[in-house]
Amino acid sequence: MKRRSVCVGDTVYVLAGNDKGKQGKVLRCLKDKVVVEGINVRVKNIKRSQENPKGKRINIEAPLHISNVRLSIDNQPARLFVKVREKGRELWNKHSDGSSSLYRSVRERKG
């Protein structure tokens, strides 16, 4: 499985779909999808029950595919590349002028 560059709590930029161009915070990471706060909101109908005699409608965030979001740095979508070191992986942000800067360092777990 390909490793993700997006983690819970990161701000991401939506590249495709109804919410294209919007930004939000990652709430959950699934296998190849992410749930973003306030993005891809769907309405779920709750049936009538003793707790809800009238029933109700709630809004939930549906997951987006990981390929439709990109990490947002300085309110712009960022292109990241990975360098593998002895201690673990490093995610680097590539700038438009050709330079790059370290964004995050991830230590590999054994086991």
From Swiss-Prot:
Specify the superkingdom: Bacteria
Q: Does S-adenosyl-L-methionine show up as a keyword for this record? A: no
Which keywords does UniProt give here? Answer: Ribonucleoprotein, Ribosomal protein, RNA-binding, rRNA-binding
Task: Report whether rRNA-binding shows up as a keyword of the record.
Answer: yes
Annotated InterPro entries: KOW, Rib_uL2_dom2, Ribosomal_uL24, Ribosomal_uL24_CS, Ribosomal_uL24_KOW, Translation_prot_SH3-like_sf
Residue ranges spanning the membrane: these are none
Molecular function (GO) terms for this protein are: rRNA binding; structural constituent of ribosome
Q: Which GO terms describe its cellular component?
A: ribonucleoprotein complex; ribosome
What GO biological process terms does the UniProt entry carry, in alphabetical order?
translation
Q: Which Gene3D superfamilies match?
A: 2.30.30.30
Q: Which NCBIfam families match?
A: rplX_bact
Quaternary structure, from the entry: Part of the 50S ribosomal subunit.
Membership in a protein family: Belongs to the universal ribosomal protein uL24 family.
Described by its record, this protein's role is as follows: One of two assembly initiator proteins, it binds directly to the 5'-end of the 23S rRNA, where it nucleates assembly of the 50S subunit. One of the proteins that surrounds the polypeptide exit tunnel on the outside of the subunit.
UniProt-recorded name of the protein? Large ribosomal subunit protein uL24
**Organism from which the protein derives:** Chlamydia trachomatis serovar A (strain ATCC VR-571B / DSM 19440 / HAR-13)
Taxonomy, top ranks, is:
Bacteria, Pseudomonadati, Chlamydiota, Chlamydiia, Chlamydiales
Gene name? Answer: rplX
